Amino acid sequence: MAVAFGSVGIHVGVTVGLDPGRDKVGWAFVGEGRELLVSGIFPAGERALFWLGLRALPGDADALAPWTLEAPLPRGEASSRMAFVTAFVVGDGTCGGELASSLEAQDFGCPILRVDERGTTLEARTLYWRLHGPSWWQRLLPRTLWVPPRPLDDLAAWAIAMRGMAGPVD
């Protein structure tokens, strides 16, 4: 599989989005159709363990299990597709440069793209409700009052990956 960067972004394979932060890092494996394969959050202090987990794929399908929050696809399908990582997209916010440098040092053999992550937390809220749907009583409230019951860093990473796949905005 090949990866091409051009006027329309990243093509072919699986893209890993990373939403860096001081305390935790959201991650998401995203297919070529922008579908979420699997996502989660790991503590920033466990970055080295997360890199080891990435290297263990696809042989060890449970390598990322300790940090996994969303896995909408059947386990076998997701783990087989996760082996074909062709690019990483890192948000340029808090600690983004540090995470990108650490990722480069790992030498995964994939390009690393930095994108503007402004607004991805709000996008993550929308993605959460698309995956889970609000309860009947939440539907009675305005959408702005729908608050997801968990941190959304992994879904922000999904939004970051999709931005990288969309290509540069002129």
Predicted regions, residues:
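Phosphate- and other anionic-substrate recognition elements at nucleic-acid/protein interfaces
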Residues: 2-170
